[in-house]
UniProtKB/Swiss-Prot annotation:
<dbReference type="Pfam" id="PF13656">
    <property type="entry name" value="RNA_pol_L_2"/>
</dbReference>
<keyword id="KW-0808">Transferase</keyword>
<comment type="similarity">
    <text>Belongs to the archaeal Rpo11/eukaryotic RPB11/RPC19 RNA polymerase subunit family.</text>
</comment>
<dbReference type="InterPro" id="IPR022905">
    <property type="entry name" value="Rpo11-like"/>
</dbReference>
<dbReference type="GO" id="GO:0005737">
    <property type="term" value="C:cytoplasm"/>
</dbReference>
<dbReference type="GO" id="GO:0003899">
    <property type="term" value="F:DNA-directed RNA polymerase activity"/>
</dbReference>
<comment type="function">
    <text>DNA-dependent RNA polymerase (RNAP) catalyzes the transcription of DNA into RNA using the four ribonucleoside triphosphates as substrates.</text>
</comment>
<keyword id="KW-0804">Transcription</keyword>
<dbReference type="GO" id="GO:0046983">
    <property type="term" value="F:protein dimerization activity"/>
</dbReference>
<keyword id="KW-0240">DNA-directed RNA polymerase</keyword>
<comment type="subunit">
    <text>Part of the RNA polymerase complex.</text>
</comment>
<dbReference type="GO" id="GO:0003677">
    <property type="term" value="F:DNA binding"/>
</dbReference>
<keyword id="KW-0548">Nucleotidyltransferase</keyword>
<dbReference type="InterPro" id="IPR009025">
    <property type="entry name" value="RBP11-like_dimer"/>
</dbReference>
<dbReference type="InterPro" id="IPR036603">
    <property type="entry name" value="RBP11-like"/>
</dbReference>
<keyword id="KW-0963">Cytoplasm</keyword>
<dbReference type="InterPro" id="IPR008193">
    <property type="entry name" value="RNA_pol_Rpb11_13-16kDa_CS"/>
</dbReference>
Length: 93
């Protein structure tokens, strides 16, 4: 995975994430939209044969786009850990 900044501003960030596809793009977009202060989050896959996505984040200024992305990843990690615990508890039944 390689991340390149395409555009950056106080409330806007556009990243190219090489080596990733719809799975990561959709996951990040969904969790970004749960972060307070995020006004807009989207991703696109410019070409179907190239493993690369473009992620766009816009905030209202109460949080930076980079902070919002980190928070979104932390939220995804928390939910993943909860899911792991649920799966483990199923095995014990």
């Amino acid at each position: 995975m390689e991340i390149k900044i395409l555009r950056s501003g106080e409330n806007y960030l556009e990243l190219q994430i090489d080596g990733e596809e719809h799975t990561v793009g959709n996951l990040l977009k969904g969790y970004l939209l749960k972060v307070p202060g995020v006004k807009f989050a989207s991703y696109s896959k410019p070409h179907p044969l190239i493993d690369s996505i473009i992620l766009k984040i816009m905030t209202d200024g109460s949080i930076s786009p980079k902070e919002a992305l980190v928070k979104a990843i932390e939220l995804a990690e928390e939910d993943t850990n909860k899911f792991i615990e649920e799966v483990k508890s199923i095995e014990k039944r």
